[in-house]
UniProtKB/Swiss-Prot annotation:
<dbReference type="GO" id="GO:0003735">
    <property type="term" value="F:structural constituent of ribosome"/>
</dbReference>
<keyword id="KW-0689">Ribosomal protein</keyword>
<dbReference type="InterPro" id="IPR016180">
    <property type="entry name" value="Ribosomal_uL16_dom"/>
</dbReference>
<comment type="similarity">
    <text>Belongs to the universal ribosomal protein uL16 family.</text>
</comment>
<dbReference type="InterPro" id="IPR036920">
    <property type="entry name" value="Ribosomal_uL16_sf"/>
</dbReference>
<keyword id="KW-0694">RNA-binding</keyword>
<comment type="subunit">
    <text>Part of the 50S ribosomal subunit.</text>
</comment>
<keyword id="KW-0699">rRNA-binding</keyword>
<dbReference type="GO" id="GO:0006412">
    <property type="term" value="P:translation"/>
</dbReference>
<dbReference type="Pfam" id="PF00252">
    <property type="entry name" value="Ribosomal_L16"/>
</dbReference>
<keyword id="KW-0687">Ribonucleoprotein</keyword>
<keyword id="KW-0820">tRNA-binding</keyword>
<dbReference type="InterPro" id="IPR020798">
    <property type="entry name" value="Ribosomal_uL16_CS"/>
</dbReference>
<protein>
    <recommendedName>
        <fullName>Large ribosomal subunit protein uL16</fullName>
    </recommendedName>
</protein>
<dbReference type="InterPro" id="IPR047873">
    <property type="entry name" value="Ribosomal_uL16"/>
</dbReference>
<dbReference type="InterPro" id="IPR000114">
    <property type="entry name" value="Ribosomal_uL16_bact-type"/>
</dbReference>
<dbReference type="GO" id="GO:0019843">
    <property type="term" value="F:rRNA binding"/>
</dbReference>
């Protein structure tokens, strides 16, 4: 599972997730991708479950890129604890994802296989997603 090796602060503020993602909106490494249509926190367990679903369907063919990383800790207090007496203990790690961000990329498989693998992965995630393809730059080649 994805977790940071070292962090400066164990407990973080929750923060706001307004607007669209600043970067990572296009498919860059692979040929096909899975793009988030709304903003949400995605846990390291959800990322791992989606990765396993994709690789199982592709049967060890192709390559998968995970474009998000869970660098933000979230905390929780024990059940039955009264208000006050400080912030809770770190519970897990999340990747804050804004709408428009490409979450996963795939290459080395056909479009049908990629579409189905990413559909299976999307069922493991708490965000609405859509299948996207890499946009080719320029229509004609300038060679020779």
């Amino acid at each position: 599972m994805l977790v940071p090796k070292r962090v400066k602060h164990r407990r973080e503020f929750r923060g706001k997730m307004r607007g669209e993602a600043k970067g990572g909106k296009e498919v860059t490494f692979g040929k096909y991708g899975l793009k988030a249509l709304d903003s949400h926190w995605i846990t390291n367990r959800q990322i791992e479950a989606a990765r396993i679903a994709m690789t199982r369907y592709m049967k060890r063919g192709g390559k998968v890129w995970i474009k998000i990383f869970p660098h933000k800790s979230y905390t929780a207090k024990a059940i039955g604890v009264r208000m006050g007496s400080g912030k809770g203990a770190p519970e897990g790690w999340v990747a804050p994802v804004k709408r428009g961000k490409v979450l996963f990329e795939i290459d080395g498989v056909s479009e049908e296989v990629a579409r189905e693998a990413l559909r299976l992965a999307s069922h493991k995630l708490p965000v609405k997603t859509k299948f996207v393809q890499r946009e080719e730059v320029g229509g004609e080649s300038n060679e020779g």
